[in-house]
Regions:
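Hydrophobic pocket-lining "lid/loop/helix" segments that shape and contact the acyl-thioester
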Residues: 22-36, 40-42, 103-123, 127, ...
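Conserved beta-strand elements of the Class I
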Residues: 47, 130-133, 198-200, 340
């Protein structure tokens, strides 16, 4: 039997995302002109949908090496070059040199467009949206979510939540929107506040900007821009069944990430995740990162280090949640109801294949399609993009 991930890998090189049928592409008049494309997805069966896309020039793997050489001012020949196709990536979206003001305007326009279009796909007016939860590894501004919501025409009183927990940020945002058990004493219960309301949840990752000052060759080859936003009505179009929250600090510095967001370091209740009320309508959820000592944006260990960081914990959490799910299905009298598909973070293909192998040893097996070949690792955006690409195939 084929591995559930290997069976889904595209054998032929992927064309540019902008050339994909159904993608609405334009050039934003910022700097020299920035390509920007979105694809709209809606499931009439499930009554929900969203938009996903990217911005910046689409580089294939050969072109990417030339781009990195120009950015670093040195050759990429030798041991530092990855076999990116084997890692599941054919393309990445990157930006030319822009000023800080241009980066801000670009990501504000991209974010506002994503929110407007995600609302429209779901048949909502922007003025009807009552919650916006966005995950970002390194926001271009502390109040980015507030700014894009305002620019998109979403009411001022709508609850805005910024989530900064690296690649987990968008799924952390979705978890907050659905699971009322995540609330702590004295703080707003986000899931209860948003139950039955029209909510936009997503991940927006300007990783070309984020890595523009990095010197780490692994990071420069893997990461790129990407975003995805879905519309949900918590408790109706999507509801929480079972789940698990797990925190693990990267003590060894296998993936060092600079925190470009407020974090006091108070470790309330011993948690690595800090929740603060940035404004009456704005909640910030910020995770503690192992920051690079040299002040650079990002420093990565090699592929073996990434496997060590992601696989062991990921497999354990999935195993625990699967046990809870199976127990729930037995209680509901549907013990044979299996998981139809798993939407997984696309850090790289080899990591996901190893996760699937380890889960299979534990008797856990379900499809985990590889869906982001023309994006690269887009951190918090990857699950949202993967979900939207899989959405037309999901049945109720």
């Amino acid at each position: 039997m084929q591995d559930p991930i290997e069976a889904s890998v595209a054998e032929a090189p992927e064309p540019s995302f902008f050339a994909r049928p159904g993608v609405h592409a334009q050039v934003l008049p910022i700097g020299p002109g920035i390509p920007f494309g979105l694809e709209r997805v809606f499931s009439s069966e499930l009554g929900m949908g969203g938009v996903y896309g990217s911005w910046g020039r689409s580089y294939d793997n050969d072109e990417l090496l030339e781009f990195i050489e120009q950015r670093l001012g040195e050759s990429m020949k030798g041991d530092g070059v990855m076999n990116l196709a084997e890692l599941g990536f054919q393309r990445r979206h990157h930006l030319p040199n822009l000023t800080e003001a241009e980066h801000l305007e670009l990501e504000l326009e991209v974010g506002a467009c994503l929110l407007r279009e995600a609302a429209r796909v779901n048949g909502w007016k922007a003025t009807e949206v009552q919650g916006v939860l966005i995950g970002m590894s390194g926001p271009v501004a502390d109040d980015y979510v507030v700014q894009i919501a305002r620019r998109a025409g979403i009411p001022h009183e709508a609850l805005k939540v910024s989530v900064h927990k690296a690649c987990d940020s968008s799924m952390g945002a979705l978890h907050l929107a659905l699971n009322p058990n995540l609330s702590s004493a004295g703080r707003v219960n986000i899931a209860e506040a948003l139950r039955g309301k029209k909510v936009l949840v997503g991940g927006i990752e300007g990783l070309s900007r984020f890595t523009s000052r990095a010197r780490d060759k692994n990071a420069l080859q893997l990461f790129g821009n990407g975003a995805g936003v879905i519309g949900v009505i918590p408790g109706q179009t999507m509801r929480f069944l079972v789940g698990k929250s797990h925190e693990a600090f990267d003590k060894e510095g296998l993936l060092e990430v600079r925190m470009y967001y407020p974090y006091s370091g108070s470790k309330d209740g011993g948690s690595l995740v800090e929740v603060s009320q940035a404004a009456p309508d704005h909640v910030r959820v910020a995770g503690l990162m192992h920051e690079p000592e040299d002040g650079s944006p990002l420093v990565m260990a090699g592929l073996i280090g990434m496997v060590k960081l992601f696989v062991r914990t990921g497999v354990q959490v999935v195993t625990d949640v699967m046990r809870e799910y199976q127990n729930l299905m037995r209680q509901l009298g549907t013990p044979d109801k299996s998981i139809a598909v798993g939407i997984v973070h696309h850090a790289n293909l080899k990591i996901n294949q190893l996760k699937a192998k380890q889960l299979n040893k534990a008797g856990i097996r379900f499809p985990m399609p590889w869906l982001l070949s023309e994006f690269g690792n887009v951190s918090a955006a990857s699950n949202m993009i993967a979900f939207l690409r899989q959405l037309p195939k999901i049945r109720s």
